[in-house]
């Protein structure tokens, strides 16, 4: 399958191919003419990013009407609280829209150790606990996961997209900044 690329996007990379004065861009990692992101990841988010040269496929991946499930691991401030986590599970009113219900689970201690170290490292406050949560959503509006966790009382420290549909970053063994053609559709 040579119309779909999977990139393990590093922190600080902007999701465009044109050069940017402050950030690295996709062209610094993928030099394949005609490929464009199927959805985006914020500059301060990391992980699985799909690129394609197929417009129909791009729409199937990025358009919320197709309900493609995207899985994120978020390191958040606070301690697990089921009442707050249930807010994410029911859907969150963010003011400009209400999110669809999300699947949410707290990661086991050490489960996020499979992730690479972030450069630069996140700020650590010894007096404020943090934990990792997995959030699965079928939409992907601007900064949605960060806004959802903040609204639930868990400010987001680090956000990594680990899967889109059946494409899982850990199954692919992609190092940070590496890419490969997708073995199958999401």
Language-model segments: what does each one mean?
Residues 1-186:
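RNA pseudouridine synthases
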